[in-house]
Amino acid sequence: MNVAEFHQKVEQVWQQIEEKIDDEALSIDTEIHGAVCTLTFDDESQIIINKQEAMLELWLASKLGGFHFAFRDGEWVTAEGRSFWTHLEEAFARHGEQISF
């Protein structure tokens, strides 16, 4: 994957997240600035998803900790093979919201 494809794939993830939050009418503020997508919950807690261009990775930070994802076989996964979407759903739950991607 080249850098342009990387950015396109991450931006698709961000778009999916925004659309799902809107579809579910969740009270979560979504802000994207440069390489960082910030999801802010009612209690002011946050999930941060950012691009790591040099490594072609997607990073996720939440109350559960920090995780790194590489794009393999058509999906974002950790080195252990856990899906980005699984981690994100668990992070939402930890922040008090139920969502399914």
Swiss-Prot record:
UniProt organism field: Actinobacillus pleuropneumoniae serotype 5b (strain L20)
One GO MF term attached to the UniProt entry: ferric iron binding
Keyword tags: Iron, Metal-binding
Domain of life of the organism encoding this protein: Bacteria
GO aspect biological process, one term: iron-sulfur cluster assembly
Pfam families for this protein: Frataxin_Cyay (PF01491)
Cell inner membrane in keyword set: no
PROSITE patterns cross-referenced by the UniProt entry: FRATAXIN_1, FRATAXIN_2
Disulphide bond pairs: none
Name of the protein in question: Iron-sulfur cluster assembly protein CyaY
Stored HAMAP family: CyaY (MF_00142)
Similarity comment: Belongs to the frataxin family.
Protein's job: Involved in iron-sulfur (Fe-S) cluster assembly. May act as a regulator of Fe-S biogenesis.
A cellular-component GO term for this protein: cytoplasm
